[in-house]
Amino acid sequence: MSPCGRALHTSRGAMAMLARKFPRTRLPVGASALCVVVLCWLYIFPVYRLPNEKEIVQGVLAQRTAWRTNQTSASLFRRQMEDCCDPAHLFAMTKMNSPMGKSLWYDGELLYSFTIDNSTYSLFPQATPFQLPLKKCAVVGNGGILKMSGCGRQIDEANFVMRCNLPPLSSEYTRDVGSKTQLVTANPSIIRQRFENLLWSRKKFVDNMKIYNHSYIYMPAFSMKTGTEPSLRVYYTLKDVGANQTVLFANPNFLRNIGKFWKSRGIHAKRLSTGLFLVSAALGLCEEVSIYGFWPFSVNMQGDPISHHYYDNVLPFSGYHAMPEEFLQLWYLHKIGALRMQLDPCEEPSPQPTS
């Protein structure tokens, strides 16, 4: 036998001896399932250290420079949005992308789907009702950093203004957040909490909607099964009274793809915030994007305490969104010139001297 053959024979014998001495055991079914759960959890919520609030604020202050738009960065990111999520065609449910008989899965639930029938199909516009590309867009979050910002006039100068979650726009706020609205989101949870699901009285809701003038009300009717009925009630309520607003239903495939896109870039949360969904859509629909009120921290740039929202200090449920992670992604897009993030107070014209 050659030396190589003897070595191979010896190796096999050693392996057989080890196998007899340490026989393989199978993991119990429960242990195997637990391993799968742990691996999935680490994939969804990986263990890593995110900078704390103070470190993020200090980092922003250290990295601030005069902002300049970068058309190359903006075009590249718009192309990425088009490739992954196609907002021009999938932003809202339409007769073109959601034909009768099509089955779609709720993007926020794993076990439920729905089939588009004649009653729902008739609620959709023929196609996305925007003249694309939109020129100059402002996406307005609700962060407390907007209070005393004087940004209302700048916001209203945009061609297309998007707002989140039916925010108050009464006269006490317009100097800071403006009054113009082309699109505003409305989560079904807001319809439940503020307007009792429109089961008892619709007048309060209709009166509240008047502040948004001729805007689109963008609702994720098919994200969670519990949100479908409240969303449909909003549609029929506004239609019955001949309101100026038009309801658009978010396409669950669009929302799902946006979630995957940001997850691949390091945002790990149960669900993205409404604000990030809107900014993502704007980056795919608009030539220029400026964002306001996207500051999820308890102090402003000068270190002074601020409220969570510009209109109240109600904190969100912890662990549902990953707001600091979202901010860091948006801050990066600001730094490369793909969008403009307004963090300082806006300059207001000096009052004219009286004669």
From Swiss-Prot:
The active site is at 321 (proton donor/acceptor). GO terms for cellular component: Golgi membrane. It catalyses: an N-acetyl-alpha-neuraminyl-(2->3)-beta-D-galactosyl derivative + CMP-N-acetyl-beta-neuraminate = an N-acetyl-alpha-neuraminyl-(2->8)-N-acetyl-alpha-neuraminyl-(2->3)-beta-D-galactosyl derivative + CMP + H(+); a ganglioside GM3 (d18:1(4E)) + CMP-N-acetyl-beta-neuraminate = a ganglioside GD3 (d18:1(4E)) + CMP + H(+); a ganglioside GD3 (d18:1(4E)) + CMP-N-acetyl-beta-neuraminate = a ganglioside GT3 (d18:1(4E)) + CMP + H(+); a ganglioside GD1a (d18:1(4E)) + CMP-N-acetyl-beta-neuraminate = a ganglioside GT1a (d18:1(4E)) + CMP + H(+). The keyword Transferase applies. Residues 1-28 are cytoplasmic. GO terms for biological process: cell population proliferation; cellular response to heat; epithelial cell proliferation; positive regulation of epithelial cell proliferation; protein glycosylation; sphingolipid metabolic process. Disulfide bonds join 137-286, 151-346. Pathway: Protein modification; protein glycosylation; Lipid metabolism; sphingolipid metabolism. Keywords: Disulfide bond, Glycoprotein, Glycosyltransferase, Golgi apparatus, Lipid biosynthesis, Lipid metabolism, Membrane, Signal-anchor, Sphingolipid metabolism, Transferase, Transmembrane, Transmembrane helix. CMP-N-acetyl-beta-neuraminate binds at residues 142, 165, 273-275, 295, 309. The keyword Cell membrane does not apply. It is a single-pass type II membrane protein. It comes from the Eukaryota. It is an enzyme of class 2 (transferase). It holds the Pfam family Glyco_transf_29. GO terms for molecular function: alpha-N-acetylneuraminate alpha-2,8-sialyltransferase activity. Its EC number is 2.4.3.8. Residues 48-355 are lumenal. The chain crosses the membrane at residues 29-47. It is found in: Golgi apparatus membrane. Glycans are attached at residues 70, 118, 213, 244. Catalyzes the addition of sialic acid in alpha 2,8-linkage to the sialic acid moiety of the ganglioside GM3 to form ganglioside GD3; gangliosides are a subfamily of complex glycosphingolipds that contain one or more residues of sialic acid. Can catalyze the addition of a second alpha-2,8- sialic acid to GD3 to form GT3. Can use GM1b, GD1a and GT1b as acceptor substrates to synthesize GD1c, GT1a and GQ1b respectively. PANTHER family: ALPHA-2,8-SIALYLTRANSFERASE, ALPHA-N-ACETYLNEURAMINIDE ALPHA-2,8-SIALYLTRANSFERASE. Belongs to the glycosyltransferase 29 family. This is Alpha-N-acetylneuraminide alpha-2,8-sialyltransferase. The lineage of its organism: Eukaryota, Metazoa, Chordata, Craniata, Vertebrata.
